[in-house]
């Protein structure tokens, strides 16, 4: 994977993303390779939020952490009734925490990823969340 950014950190971080990302996240690779780490991380997490909204049939006004808590919380369309209650809470908190930590801040202010590895790991976290959502989509279909 070729990056326009130089230095060992940028190259190593780009190599982390040299994997088959979820099809809805493939477009963030180009932003990352251009050194637009903040945009790549934000765009990846935004895709997670969009997918949760689609699967839960939530209104567009319900956003961020509130969307995650409603969608995966008790009685939420994406909550898995087969899971142990603690595991259901864990999934809800995983999604709420990821969105609250990595998607919300750049929505409201400038966030600087000085470490490209951190930004690549945000993209990989979004990839995992999208794969979990694929499994959820199959269950709620």
Annotate the PLM regions.
Residues 1-98, 112-117, 135-141:
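Amphipathic alpha-helical interface elements
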Residues 119-137:
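Structured adenosyl-cofactor binding patch, chiefly the S-adenosyl-L-methionine
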